[in-house]
């Protein structure tokens, strides 16, 4: 059980039987009266966001969430199949549950799948993934302006900006939190 004073960005709790995560948080203490906690919440099932103000003394139930490492197998008709590496059970997530992770998701990637009351509701990619560049314009020597980048298409079809020295066919490390190039990977 959480108290209003426990509210922080990233905290997960239940309201009316649905899991919510705090996206943004502000604390206000007026000169008189109770402290106010203004929160921007995201419903972890529907993805809907809204603002809500809580008062000190409000209480919340902890969300009964579980995380399992699961391996991505394939996609079929807008559904993505993941397999538990221990029990070999398969779970399907819809495109709305996978979200932007679809841009960096390739076969056999181990992800953390989030469950609420036994039902898969979302996933988190590892912090870094290695993907191959399948299309990139050649680099002309002399085009070395500081901080220059060029577009490159990854094996998943997602386009990112890479330094000019990265060529087609090379393996690159991508930060999944920012969807940005980190470094080349030696094979």
Swiss-Prot record:
Entry keywords, A to Z: Cytoplasm, Elongation factor, Protein biosynthesis
GO molecular function: translation elongation factor activity
Pathway the protein takes part in: Protein biosynthesis; polypeptide chain elongation
A Pfam family reported for this protein in Swiss-Prot or TrEMBL: EFP_N
CDD domains: S1_EF-P_repeat_1, S1_EF-P_repeat_2
Cellular compartments per GO CC: cytoplasm
Task of the protein: Involved in peptide bond synthesis. Stimulates efficient translation and peptide-bond synthesis on native or reconstituted 70S ribosomes in vitro. Probably functions indirectly by altering the affinity of the ribosome for aminoacyl-tRNA, thus increasing their reactivity as acceptors for peptidyl transferase.
Protein name: Elongation factor P
């Amino acid at each position: 059980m959480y108290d209003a004073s426990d509210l922080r960005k990233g905290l997960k709790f239940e309201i009316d039987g649905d899991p919510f995560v705090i996206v943004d948080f502000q604390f206000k203490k007026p000169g008189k009266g109770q402290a106010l906690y203004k929160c921007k919440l995201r419903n972890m099932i529907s993805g809907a966001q809204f603002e809500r103000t809580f008062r000190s003394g409000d209480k919340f139930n902890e969300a009964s969430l579980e995380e399992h490492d699961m391996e991505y197998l394939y996609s079929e008709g807008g559904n993505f199949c993941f397999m538990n590496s221990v029990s070999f059970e398969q779970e399907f997530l819809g495109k709305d549950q996978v979200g932007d992770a679809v841009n960096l998701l390739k076969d056999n990637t181990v992800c953390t799948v989030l469950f609420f009351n036994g039902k898969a509701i979302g996933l988190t990619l590892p912090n870094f993934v290695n993907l191959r560049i399948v299309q990139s314009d050649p680099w002309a020597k002399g085009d070395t302006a500081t901080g220059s980048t060029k577009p490159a298409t990854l094996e998943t079809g997602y386009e990112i900006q890479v330094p000019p020295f990265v060529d087609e066919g090379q393996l690159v490390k991508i930060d999944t939190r920012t969807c940005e190039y980190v470094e080349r990977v030696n094979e």
